[in-house]
């Protein structure tokens, strides 16, 4: 897919982070960087551990030219894979791009180098509302890179025909509404995302740790489930763009791609993404430096380079992602910037919530409830 693979974010993150082996096929070790030169600019090899298709090729080429460097990318498909690989002993990565709740795990485990902010003058370009988070006060370890929202995407033609207003979570969770398009709804195969959506629908903080709240959310999901066709995190872009599915809970970047694909196929509908009236989950990916980084000087140079407005804008133009960089906005294509599910107004932005890492007891309870839901 064009965007990075959707994430089933950290259902058992600490357990995965502490494993000693993950059973995956070994990837080549990160490239070794030659000794730094005496030039004022750092150079050598930058080992980047990133989501697939999550940096524009022209951005990489420009960085390599400016610094006389070589960027070697290794990819992960979700945060669990990345955490498991690092927990199993993988080293040699300079910059890694974890989502915020995976970042929280890495900080707690002591896996990251503190940033030298004197080497990051472009921090001034960042949007204040995405900085200084509860899990990384003062951005000691991280700089936000890009973000997506977990929202509702829909086929505008089919929703109009069904008489459904898809701008609220009622479209997914109220059986009287959702079953109007029974069999044509797909939701992410992720307890993080589905429970969070149910919490927001019920007016509950998605970071709740209350057992009663989890039981209420599970009941709401169970009541709506007969109206849904599938739990799907892998192929819903295609299902929407082909017209098989009409309504979905998914990622804003994926709905952007689904609409591009529908237009390319000359479909007579659009795939529209909306932030539900009740609010939504915000997933921020961050740039960090691993404790084993062989070239921390070049890592700092790369992070600072990526905070320049034009460089930051190129990812948004490539995949339709949200952008944490205020200086990038002037370089983002108008059709991307017009996507209100990615670039909402200030009032809507206040309704977005980042997920925190759940305590172990709540992870176990949620896992049990999720199993009950799936086998219902």
Model feature map: region roles:
Residues 102-105, 247-268:
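A ligand-binding cleft/hinge motif common to bilobed small-molecule-binding domains
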Residues 153-158, 201-203, 283-295, 314:
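A bilobed periplasmic-binding-protein/Venus flytrap-type ligand-binding module shared by bacterial periplasmic
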Residues 23-25, 30-106:
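Early extracytoplasmic/lumenal segment of secretory-pathway proteins
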Residues 18-21:
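C-terminal motif of bacterial Sec signal peptides marking the signal peptidase cleavage site
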Residues 50, 92, 97-242, 258:
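Extracytoplasmic ligand-binding site segments that recognize negatively charged/polar headgroups
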Residues 290-351:
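Mature extracytoplasmic/periplasmic domains
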Residues 238, 346-376:
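Conserved C-terminal helix/tail region of periplasmic/extracytoplasmic solute-binding proteins
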Residues 125, 214-222, 229, 267-291:
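Periplasmic-binding protein-like
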């Amino acid at each position: 897919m064009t965007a990075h693979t959707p994430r089933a974010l950290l259902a058992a993150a600490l357990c995965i982070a502490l494993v000693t082996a993950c059973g995956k096929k070994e990837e080549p070790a990160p490239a070794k960087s030659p000794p730094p030169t005496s030039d004022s600019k750092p150079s050598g090899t930058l080992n980047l551990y990133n989501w697939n298709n999550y940096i524009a090729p022209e951005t990489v080429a420009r960085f390599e030219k400016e610094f006389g460097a070589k960027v070697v990318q290794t990819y992960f498909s979700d945060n669990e894979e990345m955490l498991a690989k690092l927990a199993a002993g993988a080293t040699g990565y300079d910059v890694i791009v974890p989502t915020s709740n995976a970042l929280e795990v890495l900080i707690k485990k002591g896996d990251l180098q503190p940033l030298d902010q004197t080497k990051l003058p472009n921090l001034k370009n960042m949007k204040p509302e995405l900085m200084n988070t509860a899990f990384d006060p003062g951005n000691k370890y991280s700089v936000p890179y890009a973000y997506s929202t977990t929202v509702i995407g829909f086929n505008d033609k089919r929703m109009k025909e069904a008489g459904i207003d898809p701008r609220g979570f009622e479209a997914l969770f109220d059986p009287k509404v959702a079953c109007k398009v029974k069999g044509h709804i797909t939701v992410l195969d992720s307890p993080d995302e589905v429970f969070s959506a149910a919490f927001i629908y019920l007016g509950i903080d998605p970071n709740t740790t209350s057992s009663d709240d989890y039981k209420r959310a599970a009941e709401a999901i169970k009541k709506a489930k007969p109206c849904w066709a599938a739990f799907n995190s892998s192929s819903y872009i295609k299902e929407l763009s082909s017209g098989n599915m009409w309504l979905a809970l998914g990622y804003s970047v994926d709905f952007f791609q689904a609409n591009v694909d529908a237009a390319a196929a000359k479909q007579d509908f659009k795939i529209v993404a909306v932030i539900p009236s009740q609010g939504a989950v915000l997933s921020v990916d961050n740039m960090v430096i691993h404790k084993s980084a062989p070239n921390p000087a070049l890592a700092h140079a790369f992070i600072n380079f990526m905070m320049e407005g034009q460089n930051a804008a190129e990812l948004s133009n490539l995949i339709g992602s949200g952008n944490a960089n205020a200086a990038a906005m002037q370089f983002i294509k108008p059709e991307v910037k017009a996507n209100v599910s990615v670039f909402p107004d200030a009032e809507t932005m206040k309704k977005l919530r980042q997920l925190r890492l759940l305590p172990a007891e709540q992870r176990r309870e949620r896992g049990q409830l999720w199993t009950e839901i799936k086998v219902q």
